[in-house]
Amino acid sequence: MMSIYFWVAIHIFSSFWMIQNIEICDFSRGSLDVALMNNKILIDNNLKEENYNDNNIKHCVIFTKGLEIFTFICPKGNNNDNYKGVEIRPEQCFEKVRINGKEENLKDILKGVVIEKKETDTEIIRKALIPPTIYQDMSFECSCDNSLTIKDNYIGARGIMKVHLKKNIIFGCDFNYDSNEPKLSNGKSAFAQFYDKQVVDSNKNIICNTQVNNKEVYLGLVCPEGYGMYPENCFENVLFEKKVINITELIKHDVKLHIEKNKNISFASFILNPNENPKSFSCHCIKNNDNSFPLIANITFSNYESYSFNFHVTYLILIFILLISYI
């Protein structure tokens, strides 16, 4: 049965969040508790890296190509002596992350990342929707460090969340690429087609054609400031033969969606069968509800395995004809 997964989130981002693929690194369940540690130390020891053993470091490792929600949970100290010195590093985890030992702004690296944070009486919670805009393999870390908590000659443990981002290709169009913005990307983009926003002219239309040649499909559209998506919920609804239809009329598989109307960003993901090629469709970016000069994103399908299939069929037919000719 096909279905579309999304969650209408009521928050400042006014976005759709898919409800599938939720990864949780929860260090609040006692794994860092100073009372559970087995290594006794002297109070006056310096808490250096070499003092740690495997029992002192708890790992949570995640691999992703995007369109997943990550949750990072760290216990609060408050009146609990077992977490008195606990710290999150970087303090604003997901807003800032450690990459190759340096703190970086995640939004400078992943276009379309959405971050939320909240606290309870006992927990600090950070959430991030990781978009599929991963232009190269990389990894980042946040840690929940209870190693500064000392009680009865025991020290707490350190919890490390390590996220491995796998390079992705987004079949779609980014009409709002900023080549002047300081980034780590060095001119790279996960989008198959991208246009510098400095050269996008509101008095000219641009036709962006993207051909999907893989059965694992990530679609994306980014509209410039002052433009809106048409259909409004692009990839939930698409333009097909000049009509707005639901994507499930063309894609007979589960579809994951993330739509940020305020930022004019939309993503979708699904998996095709081998050699399956749905009919083409499109979405537009239109300025001030005027479709005179739209920025058009056309999505066509030429599933990679279909080439292999056709090649082998043609090859077998030729062999068969040659054999017949010799008989």
UniProtKB/Swiss-Prot annotation:
It is found in: Cell surface; Cell membrane. Keywords: Cell membrane, Disulfide bond, Glycoprotein, Malaria, Membrane, Repeat, Signal. It holds the Pfam family s48_45. SMART domains: s48_45 (SM00970). InterPro entries: 6_CYS_dom, 6_CYS_dom_sf. Disulfide bonds join C25-C60, C74-C144, C93-C142, C173-C208, C223-C285, C234-C283. Its main location: other. Residues 21-168, 169-304 form the 6-Cys domain. GO terms for cellular component: cell surface; plasma membrane. Glycans are attached at N246, N264, N298. It comes from the Eukaryota. This is Surface protein P12p. It comes from Plasmodium berghei (strain Anka).
